[in-house]
Amino acid sequence: MKKTAIALLAWFVSSASLAATPWQKITHPVPGAAQSVGSFANGCIIGADTLPVQSDNYQVMRTDQRRYFGHPDLVMFIQRLSHQAHQRGLGTVLIGDMGMPAGGRFNGGHASHQTGLDVDIFLQLPKTRWSQAQLLRPQALDLVSRDGKHVVPSRWSSDIASLIKLAAEDNDVTRIFVNPAIKQQLCLDAGSDRDWLRKVRPWFQHRAHMHVRLRCPADSLECEDQPLPPPGDGCGAELQSWFEPPKPGTTKPEKKTPPPLPPSCQALLDEHVL
């Protein structure tokens, strides 16, 4: 467990120790009507909103990193979700990385979060609000067992499941990434109400947070949506494949060279940075 905690901490702070990308040199949102441009892993945003860091329903972590920008739809989603959580007495929603002022590529920790439509949310709901020191150096709560096959019962709660379900039932949400063991527990607990599980997708890591992704806004004409998740609740063979040992000869994919930026994003960089 100690090794896992260290790995989680390293994941959350790694980006601070790497060289800045050009996008990190843009310190304020680019003026203009809100437009998400490109794909989630290769894009930018014009006219981003700033998530207010003061709220009765949520708290923003690591504000010193200035990653609390996004499309207005994302800001409204966070406010909507945290209000629903507050109404149900679930606790305070802890907001992690959204995007940078103009979106774009991070120097580490994320491949996506580039178009202002992604947010990481901790899977813990404190009843007592965190101090500023806790928010600046958050301690992730690893919900998954060391072998990765199930959640830790003492750390899992119906409130966490309710938070994920609330997010999945939001019309603007297209995907929620969680660890396969968390998805498995949601499948076990869901009962007959299962339509929302389609949006909850198993993915590597994501042991302590969920990564919520919104659909492209209708008026963001240069935004590239992902295909919809496959039909069904995703609780069958696809999910079980995540728990199978790697096939012999399987190797990690080579690191790919980033693709060219969408022209509008390159023009934005040319004007504001280069």
From Swiss-Prot:
Which enzyme class, named as a word? hydrolase
List the molecular function annotations (GO) for this entry. Answer: metal ion binding; metalloendopeptidase activity; serine-type endopeptidase activity
Q: Where Zn(2+) 2 is bound, by residue?
A: 147, 150
Signal peptide feature range: 1-19
Query: Where in or outside the cell?
Result: Periplasm
**GO CC: one term?**
outer membrane-bounded periplasmic space
Query: Which co-factors does it depend on?
Result: Zn(2+)
Residues at which Zn(2+) 1 binds: 110, 113, 120, 211
Q: Where is this region: Disordered?
A: 225-274
Q: Does the keyword Transport apply?
A: no
Keywords, A to Z, come to: Disulfide bond, Hydrolase, Metal-binding, Metalloprotease, Periplasm, Protease, Signal, Zinc
Q: List the disulfide bonds.
A: 44-265, 187-235, 216-223
Quote the record's cofactor note: Binds 2 Zn(2+) ions per subunit. Zn(2+) ion 1 is bound in the active site. Zn(2+) ion 2 is bound at the dimer interface by residues from both subunits.
Indicate where this protein is primarily found.
Answer: periplasm
Keyword Signal tagged: yes
Name the GO terms of the biological process aspect. Answer: peptidoglycan metabolic process; proteolysis
Highest taxon of the lineage: Bacteria
Q: Name one Pfam family in it.
A: Peptidase_M74
Q: What does this protein do?
A: Murein endopeptidase that cleaves the D-alanyl-meso-2,6-diamino-pimelyl amide bond that connects peptidoglycan strands. Likely plays a role in the removal of murein from the sacculus.
Its quaternary organisation is:
Dimer.
Protein name, entry field = Penicillin-insensitive murein endopeptidase
